[in-house]
Amino acid sequence: MTTIWPILSSLIWLPILGAAVVLAVGEHRASLARVLSLIIAGLTFLLSISLFTGFDTSTAAMQFTEMKPWIEAFSINYALGVDGFSVPLILLTTFFGVLVVIAGWEVITEKVHQYMACFLLMEGLMVGVFSALDAILFYAFFEAMLIPMFLVIGMWGGPNKVYATIKFFLYTFLGSVFMLIGLIYLYIQSGTWSILEWHQFPLALNVQKWLFLGFLAAFSVKIPMWPVHT
């Protein structure tokens, strides 16, 4: 199902652009930064509710799809869509976005605008991860999440925040290299970056195992999953 109104793009870019607005508020207007962040997170959550209620559970096809050429020289598209698995994850993401703003309302007292902007940015990027149908678009959203996560750990982390930040960056970077290799391999073999077309592409069992390990390395660090959680 393709919609006239790009609801998925709205869910992605509302918190991302909202993060820029909150960041522009400045350090000395913390109360305004909190209120704006709550409004933006609340509106994003309401949008996700309309996505959830408008989802047709009688079909397994991708819904609310959007498709626009992005980097035509490499057949990369701005392609979005959701299925019955990704819709609840988007709803959960936007719900937690509201909770994060509320949880940091009194706890975060320094650089409030930066803190709120980081989480709004992360929220939009996570929605992008759950709705991307182009592998490079997915990779861009997935890796861009490293930026706000890196800043949050480095600026508001515990006593060992510098060590934790460096370790997190190295782990994530290493895992991302394995994923990128896997994505490039799939593109070379299939001639497309479309994740939906990859579903239909035949691969040898050994190749599937190696690709699984590459993607597992990237996802394990971001989740984080034992034994790379510390």
Protein language model features and the residues they cover:
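Hydrophobic alpha-helical transmembrane segments of multi-pass membrane proteins
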Residues: 82, 92, 170, 213-220
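Membrane-embedded alpha-helical segments of multi-pass membrane proteins
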Residues: 13-17, 43, 141-148
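Transmembrane helix-loop-helix hairpins at membrane boundaries of multipass inner-membrane proteins
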Residues: 1-7, 21-117, 191-202
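Alpha-helical transmembrane segments of multipass membrane proteins
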Residues: 19-24, 49, 98-102, 124-128, ...
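N-terminal signal-anchor/start-transfer transmembrane helix
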Residues: 10-29, 217, 224
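Hydrophobic residues within membrane-embedded alpha-helical segments of Major Facilitator Superfamily
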Residues: 18-21, 40, 44, 89, ...
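Short helix-boundary/re-entrant hairpin motifs in multi-pass inner-membrane proteins
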Residues: 164, 210-230
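Alpha-helical multi-pass transmembrane bundles of energy-transducing inner-membrane proteins
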Residues: 28-30, 117-121, 125-207
